[in-house]
Amino acid sequence: MPYTVTIRVGPRITRTRHEELRDAIDSLEVQLTTLGPAARRETRKALTREYSPADQVSARGELSGPSRLRPRVQAGADVRGDGSIEVYRGKVRRAPIAVEPGERPFEALRRTLGA
């Protein structure tokens, strides 16, 4: 069974399948880093609270596989409204992955998943 990459940008959802974990992470990186201005958000107000662009998730990419029933890999990345990217492990309980100095977020994801 292949790895599945799911990209969510607003109401739009796209899914791609990849045979290798390395290819799936590469696809996730390309799709999320090429969003450019579409990922930017302005400060929003809701009732009495204000949400800065860094507090808003403008796009989410999820990686799972190789099986659908009990996938061995569940990870992903959030693109924040200020353009920053945060990678994580898990699906329901997301645990952020620490990015070491001089390391890009997707390099940290590759290191953590062993790809």
Where are the language model's segments positioned?
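A short, charged, amphipathic alpha-helix used as a generic interaction element across diverse proteins
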Residues: 20-36
